[in-house]
């Protein structure tokens, strides 16, 4: 299914501005634009709605798996027995069949996260729930930072939704040779990462790192570490809390990934150049 919805600009009585120098006047022309679809997606565990988030409606099974792992709802992929994506009134339900042990724990957390766009603190009742006490990551990988420029090119070229709409974030998983293994896109940067982590959960032997097109927030660091991935690279900056958490989890965190440059915040032992 094509989840990109096309609207003619004339329908909305708007014009796409196009500058042309002609007799010192500005001309305008009607143009058709691609808009990224954004819909409410409810994650329903064992028949009970847990959260509603605004998402791009694709790769939703990956989203459910990645969100469940990163939020600590499940301990391993096999704790989910089944995932069904079902159209609902004005949105989509992702119905997740969860192991009883995990469902009992989920109900005890008493989280109400309706209306989120991917921010993990919204709806959390206790501040202790924000800062997860994760074990330090082992150091099992090394990456040649000289390969980063090629990774950035691959990431940009693979962003189909981003190229067509200009309004989505992307998260990519690269192996240690710098090859793009998977890319996920979404209107929300955290959701794009959740979708990627859901894919990664099905590839237990995959060694590599995550590259995202956004800043590195504390929650993105936490999600990455919770899924056992040792390195997160962001195109924009990291926040102070993200750096502090990366140090605690012994995760390699890199920001300002641009052509010919990068800022290493933590975990330089996994990098060489």
Curated annotation (Swiss-Prot):
One of its GO terms (molecular function) is sulfur carrier activity. InterPro entries: Cytidine_deaminase-like (IPR016193), FdhD (IPR003786). Keywords: Cytoplasm, Molybdenum cofactor biosynthesis. GO terms for cellular component: cytoplasm. It is found in: Cytoplasm. Transmembrane segments: none annotated. GO terms for biological process: Mo-molybdopterin cofactor biosynthetic process. It comes from the Bacteria. Gene3D superfamilies: 3.10.20.10, Cytidine Deaminase, domain 2 (3.40.140.10). Mo-bis(molybdopterin guanine dinucleotide) binds at residues 256-261. Coiled coil: none annotated. Pfam families: FdhD-NarQ (PF02634). The active site is at residue 119. NCBIfam families: fdhD_narQ. Required for formate dehydrogenase (FDH) activity. Acts as a sulfur carrier protein that transfers sulfur from IscS to the molybdenum cofactor prior to its insertion into FDH. Belongs to the FdhD family. This is Sulfur carrier protein FdhD. It comes from Pasteurella multocida (strain Pm70). The gene is fdhD.
């Amino acid at each position: 299914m094509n989840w990109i919805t096309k609207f003619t600009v004339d329908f909305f009585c708007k014009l796409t501005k196009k500058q042309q120098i002609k007799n010192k006047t500005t001309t305008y022309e009607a143009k058709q634009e691609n808009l990224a679809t954004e819909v409410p997606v409810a994650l329903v565990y064992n028949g009970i709605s847990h959260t509603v988030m605004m998402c791009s409606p694709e790769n939703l099974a990956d989203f459910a798996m990645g969100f469940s792992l990163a939020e600590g709802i499940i301990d391993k992929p096999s704790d989910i027995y089944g995932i069904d994506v079902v159209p609902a009134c004005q949105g989509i339900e992702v119905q997740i069949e969860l192991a009883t042990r995990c469902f009992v724990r989920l109900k005890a957390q008493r989280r109400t996260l309706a209306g989120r766009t991917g921010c993990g603190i919204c709806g959390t009742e206790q501040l202790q729930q924000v800062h997860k006490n994760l074990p330090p990551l082992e150091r099992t990988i090394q990456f040649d930072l000289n390969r980063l420029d090629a990774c950035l090119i691959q990431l940009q070229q693979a962003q189909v939704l981003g190229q067509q709409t200009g309004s989505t974030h992307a998260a990519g998983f690269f192996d240690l040779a710098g090859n793009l293994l998977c890319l996920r896109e979404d209107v929300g940067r955290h959701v794009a990462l959740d979708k990627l982590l859901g894919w990664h959960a099905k590839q237990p032997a995959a060694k590599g790192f995550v590259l995202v097109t956004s800043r590195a927030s504390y929650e993105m660091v936490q999600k990455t570490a919770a899924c056992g991935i040792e390195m997160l690279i962001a195109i924009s900056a990291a926040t102070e809390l993200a750096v502090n958490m990366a140090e605690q989890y012994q995760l390699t965190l890199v920001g300002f990934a641009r052509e010919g440059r990068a800022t290493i915040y933590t975990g330089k032992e996994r990098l060489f150049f």
